Amino acid sequence: MTAMTVPPSLLPLEPFPTAPDTRASTPHIRLHGLGKRYPGGVQALREIDLEIRRGEVFGIIGRSGAGKSSLIRTLNRLERPSEGQVLIDDEDIGGYDGQRLVALRRRIGMIFQHFNLMSAKTVRQNIALPLRVAGVPRARIEERVAGLLQLVGLEEKRDAYPAQLSGGQKQRVGIARALVHQPQILLCDEATSALDPESTQAILALLRDINRRLGLTIVLITHEMAVIREICDRVVVLECGRIVEQGEVWEVFGDPRHAVTRSLLGSLRAALPADLQARLRQAPGAGDPVLLDLQYTGASRRVPDLLAIARAIGQRVDLLHGGIERIQGRALGRLLLQVGAPPGELPGVLAKAALVADKVEVLGHVAHA
């Protein structure tokens, strides 16, 4: 596999001030005691403390009204916090105004759910617009736009108009336009919510590619756990303006602690099938096997081994249902096993099952069909 290179036209228009010796070990973005209150007393954010590492893809998820949009919009000062601090490269941006605020927003690109393209301008003209407004020389604009069209895969659509593009192509234009000033941070506000599943996967793959090739820090908000699973390194869960859970994606998916997280994960986790649920009893009938839930949270890096499970339990074992997926190199999921063990032997069966899974739970007994 050949190494990918960044087109020369994607080099910065002008260098950003950096201090590698002091910034290398600090978070790229840090929020301390952040709060946001709107007129009428609506408290959108409460006591948010958060660190986002340089170069990571960081996800913010929550239900509608949880405070996701308010949070992401404080990062480029589209919203001014009511309390607390937003620090970029360890510098508080709360006092920025005028030219300092303009410079900040050029360092922080943003894409939205709705593409906000100018219908009377071509793809090339839409991408070039921020550079024209900034007074960048024409030749430099053409070079820069050509590199961005190559990056997002729209070279052949350079002279097309938005009405001639698919939703995924429109979002690619939005991404290219957000990158014109060579930002260090890219904010994504529900960037795939208006797309079909195929276009969603393509846009997420493009964002991950951009993250790796350009070293951008990407912060995205979504209400879809599948998006978090696909692209993010770490995630926070918001509810009523507060962080209720956070961690590496595999940690949050493998062992969700908060009810909101479990609810958001509901459609992605292997649920108990209805026919099996109908046969489940808490008190065993004569000869009814026990139903065990073997859970794999990723904490031990254990990989489910069906033969090892059968040998460890040492009883008649039937796999009735389950699902395992890999997230960040770890196996996560659950296996539902029907085990033909007499009640007196159940403690020993559970002890053995605990040797081959991260968590074991007795769900009940399966009545004979």
Curated annotation (Swiss-Prot):
Subcellular location: Cell inner membrane
Membership in a protein family: Belongs to the ABC transporter superfamily. Methionine importer (TC 3.A.1.24) family.
Gene this chain is encoded by: metN1
Subunit text: The complex is composed of two ATP-binding proteins (MetN), two transmembrane proteins (MetI) and a solute-binding protein (MetQ).
Enzyme nomenclature, EC number: 7.4.2.11
Pfam families: ABC_tran, NIL
Protein name: Methionine import ATP-binding protein MetN 1
Lineage: Bacteria, Pseudomonadati, Pseudomonadota, Gammaproteobacteria, Pseudomonadales
GO molecular-function term, one example from the UniProt record: ABC-type D-methionine transporter activity
Catalytic class of the enzyme: translocase
Membrane topology category: Peripheral membrane protein
Record function comment: Part of the ABC transporter complex MetNIQ involved in methionine import. Responsible for energy coupling to the transport system.
Start and end residues of each ABC transporter domain: 29-265
Reactions this protein catalyses: L-methionine(out) + ATP + H2O = L-methionine(in) + ADP + phosphate + H(+); D-methionine(out) + ATP + H2O = D-methionine(in) + ADP + phosphate + H(+)
Residues reported in the UniProt entry to bind ATP: 62-69
Cross-referenced InterPro entries: AAA+_ATPase, ABC_transporter-like_ATP-bd, ABC_transporter-like_CS, ACT-like_dom_sf, MetN_ABC, MetN_ABC_transporter-like, NIL_domain, P-loop_NTPase
Entry superkingdom: Bacteria
Keywords: Amino-acid transport, ATP-binding, Cell inner membrane, Cell membrane, Membrane, Nucleotide-binding, Translocase, Transport
UniProt GO cellular component terms: plasma membrane
